[in-house]
């Protein structure tokens, strides 16, 4: 764009235009000014303060400012003198294109009165643009037989100025064959046409070079030139002709891209190349060429971009039809864009407050806003509304402005923030609407104390908590805001167990987090009662209290304590006595333990951790009772060691163990008798005696077996036969003499017993059975380990495999179950080679009986080497009263022959007051005890 031309009379013209605009505005109740374009920034437009009847110093007092409609600010107010000045350089062509008049409308807002004054400024065009050809060179082809006065359209010339400053005429360089003529259109610019003035002769001159000059009517005149190349063609006496000179069509603005608008058609009477017609656009701007496209072969015009009624409602297109040699015809295409309601209304908040006091009276103005719609007609008419449930209403102001005012009293405690939705709806079909939210805060007063969500709190803390750990948090809510809602927390002063409460817990005054200042112990402190106070920071401050109960939860921090059996002070292990005649389930002792914890942390369970003889004893899971799991055998060791574990149910569980020593014997004299018989024989004839005894026992067993078979055959009792066959077999275990200890070792063994036991000495039976107990509360430990005991029989004797059913007289209990490890071997499964040496004649048998009687007599007359007072069997005083000589049994009653139910002497005593299960004689002891 060319710079504006300065004229001597410019200032007088501006002053005259300003004066006329002022007088016209006063008469029409609207302020109007007129200025030329391209004025410098800050150029004077008009004295707006004077036209409003104000003084310059009142501008700031009344809040006078310019309010424009969504476009850039072109004008501004001079705060010193109140004059209206330009905010920058104004280009009329950019602002209004080629409109005959260019008017800029805006409003002057008086802020304190909320009054609007419309202002209109006309931008007057100046000659600041030079006419410009779209092409600097143009080739024109003319048939040599073209008639004089034929016209040929030339390229379009563009001048954005209007009036006299726009394109006015053309001038062609001197030539006798051609002249230029100016054509103008009602809705378009002027364009030149080349006029043929005479007859052409291609043979005389085939090419003409012309210079075309375009001039406007400004002062001074602006002009531009273009080169025209005229080529004379051979005869083509028919030009393309459009079916109509002007095509008109109306399309909606929401037409999809690529949709055909219309098709132009031109015909040529020639044939061949001279009759082939192509189409092209002429006299269109670059913007139009981006919106529409033309098919060069069919003449169909379609859209290549979206149409917008608000951007342009009318398009004029030039279409040219050209045949092969270059003859052409032109037509106009007039496209009218129909408005569619495709623009939603817009809401622009001009002024307003974001905060209002809750004591504001009804009618208080909150905001001023403007609504407009870019559509036209009914599509551009807009109405506004807000929800009726709100204490606000809309009042119509100047033009399309609205005021938002209150119509009821406000209460911040009920609603502290209003999001007022302003809905603007046009009257199009279908109607479009938009929503704008105006947020309004209600100012607060301190009229609400802090409140806790609960009337009381219960806090549960695990004991042994770390000091300083956060254990709970309280939160009080204050419906007020800002300073009135800042809550601080504190604890009421109190004492607990002689110490201030503040030494136990503390509270963060800002967050309300409660901290433990001590590590709590459930066994010492189980609960605390606190009062928490919440106060706000208003003036005056308000507060409230809440009760908080703190409960200490138990942790599994105490292991079970063994109360019984108690560990003696001398470090020895207590001894319990289990008679060999004890049946399965016999109560040997009971382990008693306690746990200082509570709940499941104090639930105790007992289990057998280790035993010298696995499967012999069991421990009640919940009772701690140590019972025999099976019948005691003579091969079982005299001394049994048990390790019982007591475990609680905490997480993780804690446990304690206790070691029990169980002496397997009917009574103390039995222990002495058994140990006395362990004297190894130094005579070589002992082995022969044992062999003879084994042979005798085998013979008796065979006779007994034959008798049983005959009896079963006579009675036809198959079941009884099976039972007797199982009891008929038996293995005899040997006992090498080199593995026994002397009787003198009994004294050291008995002196290790520090736990007092109650023994009975009237049992003379060796009742051995192997049932598997089935107590619901008993755990049987199957672990086994080997331990050398000086008072136990040899390992070879323990591992002797014999059928224990040979040694029992009572029928078996079918409710018991045998584990695979406890299941005895079959009858007669033992090798004969594994049996020991037994007395082989009557003399040897009598010698064995004499040895047993001598041991008993020695104990009776106090000559035993075990020591101790008379009649006490060498025991200490704590056992003396229970074991006098009158309780010493006749050991001959326990002597029997293996495989037979008969003893050497008849036994009158009965264990536990029960009769033997079968036979008239006493129950026999195992072969191991007989060998002893």
UniProtKB/Swiss-Prot annotation:
Residues 922-932 have a biased composition (Basic residues). One of its GO terms (biological process) is cell adhesion. InterPro entries: Cadherin-like_dom, Cadherin-like_sf, Cadherin_C, Cadherin_CBD, Cadherin_CS, Cadherin_N, Protocadherin/Cadherin-CA. Residues 714-932 are cytoplasmic. It comes from the Eukaryota. It is a single-pass type I membrane protein. It is found in: Cell membrane. Keywords: Calcium, Cell adhesion, Cell membrane, Glycoprotein, Membrane, Repeat, Signal, Transmembrane, Transmembrane helix. Residues 1-29 form the signal peptide. GO terms for cellular component: plasma membrane. Residues 30-692 are extracellular. Its main location: membrane. Residues 806-841 have a biased composition (Polar residues). One of its GO terms (molecular function) is calcium ion binding. Glycans are attached at residues 81, 419, 545, 685. Residues 30-133, 134-242, 243-347, 348-452, 453-562, 570-682 form the Cadherin domain. CDD domains: Cadherin_repeat. The chain crosses the membrane at residues 693-713. Potential calcium-dependent cell-adhesion protein. May be involved in the establishment and maintenance of specific neuronal connections in the brain. This is Protocadherin gamma-A6. The lineage of its organism: Eukaryota, Metazoa, Chordata, Craniata, Vertebrata.
């Amino acid at each position: 764009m060319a710079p504006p031309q300065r004229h001597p009379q410019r200032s007088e013209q501006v002053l005259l235009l300003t004066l006329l605009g002022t007088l016209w505005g006063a008469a029409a109740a609207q302020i109007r000014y007129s200025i030329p374009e391209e004025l410098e920034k800050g150029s004077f437009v008009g004295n707006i303060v004077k036209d409003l009847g104000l003084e310059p110093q009142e501008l700031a007092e009344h809040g006078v400012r310019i309010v424009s409609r969504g476009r850039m600010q072109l004008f501004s107010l001079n705060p010193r003198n109140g004059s209206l000045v330009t905010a920058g350089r104004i280009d009329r062509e950019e602002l209004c294109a080629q409109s005959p008049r260019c008017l800029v409308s805006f409003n002057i807002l008086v802020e304190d009165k909320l009054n609007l004054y419309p202002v209109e400024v006309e931008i007057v065009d100046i000659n600041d643009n030079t006419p410009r050809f779209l092409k600097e060179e143009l080739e024109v082809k003319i048939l040599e037989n073209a008639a004089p006065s034929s016209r040929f359209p030339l390229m379009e010339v563009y001048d954005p100025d209007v009036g006299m400053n726009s394109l006015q005429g053309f001038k062609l360089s001197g030539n006798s064959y051609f002249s230029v003529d100016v054509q103008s259109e009602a809705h378009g610019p002027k364009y030149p046409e080349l006029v043929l003035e005479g007859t052409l002769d291609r043979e005389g001159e085939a090419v003409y070079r012309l210079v075309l000059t375009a001039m406007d009517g400004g002062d001074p005149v602006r002009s531009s030139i273009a080169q025209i190349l005229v080529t004379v063609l051979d005869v083509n006496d028919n030009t393309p002709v459009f079916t109509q000179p002007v095509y008109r069509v109306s399309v909606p603005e929401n037409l999809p891209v690529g949709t055909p608008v219309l098709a132009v058609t031109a015909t040529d009477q020639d044939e061949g190349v001279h009759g082939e017609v192509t189409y092209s656009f002429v006299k269109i701007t670059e913007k139009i060429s981006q919106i529409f496209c033309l098919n060069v072969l069919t003449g169909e015009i379609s859209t290549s971009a979206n149409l917008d009624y608000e951007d342009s409602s009318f398009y004029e297109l030039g279409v040219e039809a050209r045949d092969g040699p270059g003859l052409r015809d032109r037509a106009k295409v007039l496209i009218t864009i129909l408005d569619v309601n495709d623009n939603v209304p817009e809401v622009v908040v001009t002024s307003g407050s974001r905060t209002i006091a809750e004591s504001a009276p009804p009618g208080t103005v909150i905001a001023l806003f403007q609504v407009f719609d870019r559509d036209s007609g009914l599509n551009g008419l807009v109405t506004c509304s807000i929800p009726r449930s709100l204490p606000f209403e809309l009042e119509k102001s100047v033009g399309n402005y609205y005021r938002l005012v209150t119509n009821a009293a406000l209460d911040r405690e009920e609603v502290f923030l209003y999001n007022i939705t302003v809905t603007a709806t046009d009257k199009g079909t279908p109607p479009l609407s938009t929503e704008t939210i105006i947020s309004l805060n209600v100012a607060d007063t301190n009229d609400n104390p802090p409140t806790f969500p609960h009337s009381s709190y219960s806090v549960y803390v695990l004991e042994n908590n770390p000091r300083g750990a956060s254990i709970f948090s309280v939160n009080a809510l204050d419906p007020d805001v800002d300073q009135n809602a800042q809550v601080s927390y504190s604890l009421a002063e109190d004492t607990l167990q002689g110490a201030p409460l503040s030494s136990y817990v503390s509270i963060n005054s800002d967050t309300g987090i409660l901290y433990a200042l001590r590590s709590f112990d459930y066994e010492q402190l189980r609960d605390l009662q606190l009062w928490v106070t919440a106060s706000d920071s208003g003036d005056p401050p308000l507060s409230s209290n809440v009760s908080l109960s703190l409960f200490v939860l138990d942790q599994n921090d105490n292991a079970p304590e063994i109360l019984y059996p108690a560990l003696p002070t001398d470090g020895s292990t207590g001894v319990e006595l289990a008679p060999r005649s004890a049946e399965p389930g016999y109560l040997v002792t009971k382990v008693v333990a306690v746990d200082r914890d509570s709940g499941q942390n104090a639930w105790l369970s007992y289990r057998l951790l280790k035993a010298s003889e696995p499967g012999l004893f069991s421990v009640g899971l919940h009772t701690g009772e140590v019972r025999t799991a099976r019948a005691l055998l003579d091969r079982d060791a005299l001394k049994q060691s048990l390790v019982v574990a007591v475990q609680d149910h905490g997480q993780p569980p804690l446990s304690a163990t206790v070691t029990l020593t169980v002496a397997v014997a009917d009574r103390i004299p039995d222990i002495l008798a058994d140990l006395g018989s362990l004297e190894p024989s130094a005579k070589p004839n002992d082995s022969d005696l044992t062999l003879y005894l084994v042979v005798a026992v085998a013979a008796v067993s065979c006779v007994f077996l034959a008798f049983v078979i005959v009896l079963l055959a006579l009675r036809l009792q198959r079941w009884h036969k099976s039972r007797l066959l199982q009891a008929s077999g038996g293995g005899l275990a040997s006992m090498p003499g080199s593995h026994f200890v002397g009787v003198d070792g009994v004294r050291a063994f008995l002196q290790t017993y520090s736990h007092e036991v109650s023994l009975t000495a009237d049992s003379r039976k060796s009742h051995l059975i192997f049932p598997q107990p089935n107590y619901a509360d008993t755990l049987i430990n199957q672990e086994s380990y080997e331990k050398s005991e000086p008072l136990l029989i040899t390992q070879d004797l323990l591992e002797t495999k014999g059928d224990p059913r040979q040694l029992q007289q009572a029928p078996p209990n079918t409710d018991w179950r045998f584990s695979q490890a406890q299941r005895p071997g079959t009858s007669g499964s033992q090798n004969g080679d594994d049996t020991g040496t037994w007395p082989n004649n009557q003399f040897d048998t009598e010698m064995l009986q004499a040895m047993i009687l001598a041991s008993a007599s020695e104990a009776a007359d106090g000559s035993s080497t075990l020591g101790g007072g008379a009649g006490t069997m060498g025991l200490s005083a704590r056992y003396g009263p229970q074991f006098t000589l009158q309780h010493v049994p006749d050991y001959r009653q326990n002597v029997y022959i293996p495989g037979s139910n008969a003893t050497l002497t008849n036994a009158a005593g009965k264990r536990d007051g029960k009769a033997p299960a079968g036979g008239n004689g006493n129950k026999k002891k195992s072969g191991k005890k007989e060998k002893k």
